[in-house]
């Protein structure tokens, strides 16, 4: 039976709403041990979300073994690409895999973009393998965003149930943009205006203007592309038969 102590609940709500909060700036996303229920950190964050297109149809397929093998292989290899020394959080939300990174420098933002191009190439490898077993191919949308966000710890003190919440644009925007990738006019990779600006700010970073196409989503400027990792593509062509 559900039980909720109203009086204690009201006290907890008021303690959260009226307590003093310390806000600190940090070049890196703070560790779990640095976070409390009364502080928060402002830091530059980049986020990448990888969202499967038409996942409802896939999950409704009666061949559960096939669906399991496809999803497990997809999630496993996307996570492998997302891992790095600078990641703060890698997770799974339904049919979506995401990564959140400390990106205080432009080179860090470029590295997150590189992960997106690897994943775009990875889909070619996965789909070749799926076709060999007569499995359906996957398409994904990849959303990218960067912003100076505020990270706070939330949960219920004393229960061990807690997590960090990202207040700002990077996480929510990347999640939203991933839903547009590989749909309609959009390429697989869709990024925020600020993320794109960081990629092309310095011409010697390897990114080229002609890779990206301008678009507007709900009045906001975004850019999209279909860039892959050429080294990965070459390896696939040499080593994996179609």
Regions found by a protein language model. Give the residues of each.
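Intrinsically disordered, glycine/charged-rich C-terminal tails and inter-domain linkers
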Residues: 1-31, 182-242
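Catalytic NTP-binding/metal-coordinating core of nucleotidyl cyclase/transferase enzymes
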Residues: 33-111
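Short helix/loop segment flanking the catalytic signature motif in cyclic-nucleotide metabolism enzymes
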Residues: 63, 92, 97-138, 144
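Hydrophobic alpha-helical membrane-association signature
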Residues: 70-74, 115, 119, 173
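Structural signal for well-ordered, non-membrane alpha-helices
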Residues: 75, 79, 120-127, 178
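Catalytic strand-loop-helix junctions within cyclic-nucleotide turnover domains
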Residues: 102-108, 142-162
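Catalytic/regulatory signature loops of cyclic-dinucleotide turnover enzymes
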Residues: 145, 169-194
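Catalytic-core segments of nucleotide cyclases and related cyclic-nucleotide turnover enzymes
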Residues: 153-178
């Amino acid at each position: 039976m559900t039980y909720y102590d109203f009086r204690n609940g009201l006290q907890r709500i008021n303690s959260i709403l009226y307590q003093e909060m310390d806000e600190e700036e940090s070049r890196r996303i703070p560790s779990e041990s640095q976070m409390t229920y009364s502080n928060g950190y402002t830091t530059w964050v980049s986020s990448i979300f990888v969202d499967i297109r038409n996942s409802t149809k896939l999950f409704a397929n009666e061949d559960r073994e096939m669906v399991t093998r496809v999803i497990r292989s997809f999630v496993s290899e996307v996570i492998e690409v997302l891992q790095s020394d600078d990641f703060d959080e890698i997770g799974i939300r339904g049919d979506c895999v995401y990564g959140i990174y400390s990106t205080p420098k432009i080179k860090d933002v470029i590295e997150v973009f590189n992960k997106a191009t690897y994943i775009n190439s990875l889909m070619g490898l996965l789909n070749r393998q799926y076709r060999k077993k007569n499995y359906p191919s996957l398409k994904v949308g990849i959303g990218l965003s960067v912003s100076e966000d505020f990270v706070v710890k939330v949960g219920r003190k004393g229960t061990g149930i807690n997590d960090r919440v990202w207040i700002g644009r990077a996480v929510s925007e990347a999640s939203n943009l991933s839903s547009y990738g590989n749909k309609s006019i959009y390429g697989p990779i869709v990024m925020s205006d600020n993320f794109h600006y960081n990629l092309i700010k310095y011409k010697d970073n390897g990114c080229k203007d002609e890779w990206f196409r301008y678009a507007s989503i709900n009045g906001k400027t975004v850019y999209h592309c279909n860039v892959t990792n050429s080294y990965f593509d070459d390896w696939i062509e040499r080593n994996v038969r179609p």
